[in-house]
Amino acid sequence: MRSIMEVETLKRLALMGANKEQVSLSSSIFATSLGMSPQTAARRLSALEEDGYITRVVTPEGQKVRITEKGITCLKSEYRDYCSIFEDGGAPVMRGKVVTGLGEGQYYISLDGYRNQFNDKLGFDPYPGTLNVRLTEPFIPAEHEAVVIAGFKGENRTFGGCKCYPVRIKGVRAAIIRPDRTSYPPNLIEIIAPIKLRESLGLRDGDEVEVTLE
């Protein structure tokens, strides 16, 4: 999301029910609810549509708007941020099920260019492999929470950077690792730890787990 005003516009649409269904929108009434001119409101809607946060259908009577999955994900991220500010309920907990990964983690985590940074920045030497968890909700962290792992050049290729997010799983210190370039959906996470989590925690595919953000 590019600006606070666009977030506010998206929130206003959700309060009108656009997160659940397509709603008819009067430009003048909508602009008044946001405290801005119809022209400015139209630009906000256009920006949201261009960025993929809403869909719009223009009719002779006005327009019909619905928030996309991307827009809902954005609102959920905002919600979690406000919960962390105002609620005194402890660290955020994510829930999901263990799944089989692609098997590429062992190779990449073993590379010294990554491994040395994991040691320095996360404080542990990771087991060469990842635990993959499919969450019930997308994992959309705030940028300031990330531990940045820089990319580097090998003998024959360049390796991209990634971001890590310290967590605990069943009391074990670990970290979610998310490459800067990934084909994984937002609700699928890879976890590294100083031990083989599957073996040490007795986990199998389909087992439900809780992942606590540090």
From Swiss-Prot:
Molecular functions per Gene Ontology: magnesium ion binding; nucleotide binding; riboflavin kinase activity
Cofactor note: Binds 1 Mg(2+) ion per subunit.
Residues holding CDP: G101, L102, G103, E104, G105, Q106, I195, K196, L197, R198
EC number(s) given by UniProt: 2.7.1.161
Any Pfam family: CTP-dep_RFKase
Classification via InterPro entries: RibK_CTP-dep (IPR039063), Riboflavin_kinase_archaeal (IPR023470), Riboflavin_kinase_CTP-dep (IPR023602), Riboflavin_kinase_dom_sf (IPR023465), WH-like_DNA-bd_sf (IPR036388), WH_DNA-bd_sf (IPR036390)
Enzyme class, first EC level, given as a word: transferase
Record family assignment: Belongs to the archaeal riboflavin kinase family.
Listed name of the protein: Riboflavin kinase
Cofactor(s) recorded in Swiss-Prot or TrEMBL: Mg(2+)
PANTHER family in alphabetical order: RIBOFLAVIN KINASE
Keyword terms: Flavoprotein, FMN, Kinase, Magnesium, Metal-binding, Nucleotide-binding, Transferase
Pathway as given in its UniProt record: Cofactor biosynthesis; FMN biosynthesis; FMN from riboflavin (CTP route): step 1/1
Residues annotated to bind Mg(2+): T130, N132
Region annotation Riboflavin kinase: where it falls in the sequence: 92-214
Role description: Catalyzes the CTP-dependent phosphorylation of riboflavin (vitamin B2) to form flavin mononucleotide (FMN).
Catalytic activity: riboflavin + CTP = CDP + FMN + H(+)
Region (H-T-H motif-like): 1-91
Statement: the UniProt record of this protein carries the keyword Cytoplasm: no
Binding site for FMN: T182, E190
